[in-house]
Amino acid sequence: MSRVKRGVTNRAKHKKVLKAAKGYYGMRGSAFRIARQQVIKSGQYAYAHRRLRKREFRSLWIQRINAAARQHGLSYSRLMNGLQQAGIEVDRKQLADLAVHEPQSFAALAERAQGALSN
């Protein structure tokens, strides 16, 4: 049985981990053992926060819609209910974008929602 030396594969493995840990603070970016632990932990954070990002953006959209709705004398929930009753299907992302970039369009939607609520 011939002896297997792992110089090439080890070098490649270390290089891969240290490349992933580039820019990390202190030994986390330069020492292989510590860098490997940090790369694994970074992957866990990235996985969790890819899911959290969706919640945070939805929350941000709702806050923006609520702020804009209150300028027109409606609460967020009454605006959404009015839009639903008026048969207007606009998702929260688009509605928040309208509230920020096109206040006139948002005002028109708010009026339609208020009209649907009063009927």
Curated annotation (Swiss-Prot):
Gene Ontology molecular function: any one: structural constituent of ribosome
InterPro entries: Ribosomal_bL20, RIBOSOMAL_L20_CS, Ribosomal_protein_bL20_C
Role description: Binds directly to 23S ribosomal RNA and is necessary for the in vitro assembly process of the 50S ribosomal subunit. It is not involved in the protein synthesizing functions of that subunit.
GO CC, alphabetical: ribonucleoprotein complex; ribosome
Pfam name, any one: Ribosomal_L20
Entry's family note: Belongs to the bacterial ribosomal protein bL20 family.
Cystine pairings recorded for this chain: none
Gene3D superfamilies the record matches: 6.10.160.10, Ribosomal protein L20
Annotated source species: Halorhodospira halophila (strain DSM 244 / SL1) (Ectothiorhodospira halophila (strain DSM 244 / SL1))
Coiled-coil residue windows: none
UniProtKB keywords: Ribonucleoprotein, Ribosomal protein, RNA-binding, rRNA-binding
Protein name (record): Large ribosomal subunit protein bL20
